[in-house]
Amino acid sequence: MSVEAYGPSSQTLTFLDTEEAELLGADTQGSEFEFTDFTLPSQTQTQGQTQSQLDNQVNGPDGVLPNGEDAVGKTSQLLAELNFEEDEEDTYYTKDLPVHACSYCGIHDPACVVYCNTSKKWFCNGRGNTSGSHIVNHLVRAKCKEVTLHKDGPLGETVLECYNCGCRNVFLLGFIPAKADSVVVLLCRQPCASQSSLKDINWDSSQWQPLIQDRCFLSWLVKIPSEQEQLRARQITAQQINKLEELWKENPTATLEDLEKPGVDEEPQHVLLRYEDAYQYQNIFGPLVKLEADYDKKLKESQTQDNITVRWDLGLNKKRIAYFTLPKTDSGDMRLMQGDEICLRYKGDMAPLWKGIGHVIKVPDNYGDEIAIELRSSAGAPVEVPHNFQVDFVWKSTSFDRMQSALKTFAVDETSVSGYIYHKLLGHEVEDVIIKCQLPKRFTAQGLPDLNHSQVYAVKTVLQRPLSLIQGPPGTGKTVTSATIVYHLARQGNGPVLVCAPSNIAVDQLTEKIHQTGLKVVRLCAKSREAIDSPVSFLALHNQIRNMDSMPELQKLQQLKDETGELSSSDEKRYRALKRTAERELLMNADVICCTCVGAGDPRLAKMQFRSILIDESTQATEPECMVPVVLGAKQLILVGDHCQLGPVVMCKKAAKAGLSQSLFERLVVLGIRPIRLQVQYRMHPALSAFPSNIFYEGSLQNGVTAADRLKKGFDFQWPQPDKPMFFYVTQGQEEIASSGTSYLNRTEAANVEKITTRLLKAGAKPDQIGIITPYEGQRSYLVQYMQFSGSLHTKLYQEVEIASVDAFQGREKDFIILSCVRANEHQGIGFLNDPRRLNVALTRARYGVIIVGNPKALSKQPLWNHLLNYYKEQKVLVEGPLNNLRESLMQFSKPRKLVNTINPGARFMSTAMYDAREAMIPGSVYDRSSTGRPSNMYFQTHDQVGMIGTGPNPMGSLNIPIPFNLVMPPMPPPGYLGQVNGPAAGRGAPKGKTGGRGGRQRNRGTGNHGSGQPNMPNSQASQDLVSQPFSQGPLTQGYITMSQPSQMSQPGLSQPELSQDSYLGDEFKSQMDVALSQDSTYQGERAYQHGGVTGLSQY
């Protein structure tokens, strides 16, 4: 069957530009290689077509055919025949199959099947119901790479390998036609095919092509089964294949029938939006944390590497350091980080067998692939021997144990959080409170830059609230704002403030800023990271202890330990006791303690209580991760992040699908807590900020820098439009599967990226001012090698240019960014480039200029990319041709659909995994759509002076989008002090007892019950968000956005709100719905109920 049969124009198959249903978009850094489903017409579809054909022949209302036959009778006869044929096919493929039959579908033509050398199974080169052939599907999912052809096939029993070096990785292999002879030579992509001096001058390396194209083996190598063969074969879906592959890991002899057995592939319970109590919360999140832990353990323990060569060295602290290189892998699965624990074993016979544990102190970078580990103890280490070592990755459960412990503490310990935060986090409706505090006269902190109007508003509001969300779009001074908030909280004198973030880099950046204010800051890091240098090492707890003058005995013991390497047992005991005392003293006297979210579970903090807690980058942390610091006594909690950028990393797809990939920040937004958005960006040239602002932030970003500020002196680069430092460079290359089998690369794009980088360097840019980013690890790895071997300038220059994945670049910036899109195919889709949050991150890293290299034909099929390409074309920066003579591309694109939902902007970029039908169907919940009533017009005419919200008619009824009602109602007068209750809504739906304490575990079962017929209205958030702010300015123009076409926000036939979906989103974001996202948006919605036969607003 030809590949063309599967094209978009095919009438036989329906193309769905989607990833697998179970591969969630929110799993932002999971596997990059996904399989797009094709759907063969099912039996019912075929029958439906037959019926419609007959209907077309029916003449008149009586359903009589022209020849007088009864139409119904004729149809029944045809259907019976169709069913009979299907039965025949069933029996054909349930009979005994030969050993070499495809393990998925049963096709057994020797010319069509390939043997997987690793799994010892046969697979065909047909696609069936999936986009990739069955053999490629298996190789990718099982992470296998070596194959053998069938002995009765046209090429005989052949193991596919490189002619030059013997490499058997089929994802690396390709062929070169020999010029003289009618033969082809198999060579690996790197290094053999890229070598300038190939063995035989008849080989033209420029003709090299991969053996796997369009996700199947080339048809001359392995025949593709005919359409008839594939139709008669066992039909298997991508989802079944995925489950079968998982089953094979446990039981290699499992079959499709085993999938039907009870207990196989049980799905975990899905996360909820609201929880009855903390026990239910723990019972849902605990199993998800365990799933992720088990997956992580299996992944780490499967990474054993043999035959490692070690280079030994001695560190300044007298500890042994082992340097080694691991075999090249670009799978992206193994994320080796500084501080990780590694076990090194000697397996040879030149010295006694030995085993040592060490911590990673250096990871591969552009300068080299070497890894360095510092050994805990060097006793018996065979330092004279370099060869025959084995590396094992030691899995540590610490992070997951601390998450589980936090979930338990939240459930059983009354003092872990305040009553208000307890109920807010569980989604209970409680009265909003204002904290009575002395506001500073000047909000800017000493040692930090002056704040702009939106930053001042954020600081002022946060200080008065027990729970706040701050949304910081790219370059809006999120770190400065957070540091200023921490400064004012610390000045209030309520004990140390705890500051956390998911990553060590984010913690270090914030620690540095807070230190500039003059506060006493302690950076608490894991003991495994104490040897790792960072910009704030001098603030680290272990280093501050070294410099304590108040404990001379500790200093003497420390000096002795440094000189000798070890202490006697009695001295060691005394040293540890003194060290613990010093640590406690430093921590208790600190103004601010900074650590990672998981680091907050450190035993050294166990006895401490923190009234105020700030979590930066909270949208990149899973919810249990956020709970680790929260349960240390939070009475005032501030979450900072941006849900329009990439979310948490969840490796286990099952856990991600169940909602572990949802951040706490996002869930609270959905519950109706409006984030305070920072509005002035100081990073990007105004021309670079226009598109992200209009598409991702409803035009609310204002520019804190001018075009003149972003003109680089001594930089001579010819931009296609001198006033717009950006362009899209049209590249017509083809994507290839990378050597890991789980990622992609594009050689043509890599060559163009090198040319552009060289041009930027020649124009005066320094190497460290350029960042090259790509969504795919395969392309990142290929680019690093390509620049080294093929760059026309000195190798050292290219080494200093940072090449990273888009995900790794979040939170970073460079003067110039080159984005390589990689994807270029006829009908496979664009994979996880579909994720709009990834595009947002990619476009907002640059300060002075952005260059995108990609294939517009492939990208324009996705509506958001189509929007970007249209925008670049309108700006006359969609270009092609040689770099020294760029010309405008004549490529045409379809008119972009309207992407901005004026009713509920920005929400489409949030992955809402926590919604399920149970939540949506609860009568009276915020998603209750049982009524069609509309509020009177007075509730539509809202004016938010903070965000400059315009007024307009409300098409909510047709959009089927749930909006939390508390964002619509007029403001209540703010309470005067903590715990004060105002108005008739007092106590409605609030937990029993005072708001300041946890009160009862059970919610008020009267008006506050989810199951009640009458919805229960939370106190209005508007009281805190609709505060007058004279500094607010209007948004950037949105003139170029097409506004004419109506917004198609829900799929036809879907009535439940949790199934509504933005029209442009790919399948990765199915189940996305618009929800209230930010302070700068028009929040209008209906939440009516039937009362006494009259539809009206519920009592406020």
Curated annotation (Swiss-Prot):
Molecular-function GO terms, alphabetical: ATP binding; DNA binding; hydrolase activity; RNA binding; RNA helicase activity; zinc ion binding
Start-end of Polar residues biased regions: 1012-1063
CDD domains: 1B_UPF1-like (cd21407), DEXXQc_UPF1 (cd18039), SF1_C_Upf1 (cd18808), ZBD_UPF1-like (cd21400)
Gene3D superfamilies: 2.40.30.230, 6.10.140.1240, P-loop containing nucleotide triphosphate hydrolases
Keyword Metal-binding listed: yes
Family according to the record: Belongs to the DNA2/NAM7 helicase family.
Name assigned to this protein: Regulator of nonsense transcripts 1
Organism of origin: Danio rerio
